[in-house]
């Protein structure tokens, strides 16, 4: 299984998301199950390297959010219009 390190997001909104992206990170969200949705931030380069692996979109992934492991699947991916960059990912708990 693929493991991705994540951190809980502090800021919300467009400005906070832009600051994340300029720092080489991007926002994401984990939802589903009986727990409340969690906004997280991911390192762009590490996720981009994992994305090219077979099974990233179809298999169960492990997100390590501040040390707590959560099993998720990729629900939706948003990309930059013309740059090869990820701008947001939705994960759903398994």
Curated annotation (Swiss-Prot):
BP GO terms, sorted: translation
CDD domains for the chain: Ribosomal_L25_TL5_CTC
Keyword terms, alphabetized: Ribonucleoprotein, Ribosomal protein, RNA-binding, rRNA-binding
Source domain of life: Bacteria
Record field: transmembrane: none
Assigned GO CC terms: cytosolic large ribosomal subunit
PANTHER family: RIBOSOMAL PROTEIN L25/GLN-TRNA SYNTHETASE, ANTI-CODON-BINDING DOMAIN-CONTAINING PROTEIN (PTHR33284), RIBOSOMAL PROTEIN L25_GLN-TRNA SYNTHETASE, ANTI-CODON-BINDING DOMAIN-CONTAINING PROTEIN (PTHR33284:SF1)
Family of the protein in this entry: Belongs to the bacterial ribosomal protein bL25 family.
NCBIfam families (alphabetical): PRK05943.1 (NF004612)
Assembly, per entry: Part of the 50S ribosomal subunit; part of the 5S rRNA/L5/L18/L25 subcomplex. Contacts the 5S rRNA. Binds to the 5S rRNA independently of L5 and L18.
Protein name: Large ribosomal subunit protein bL25
Name of the gene: rplY
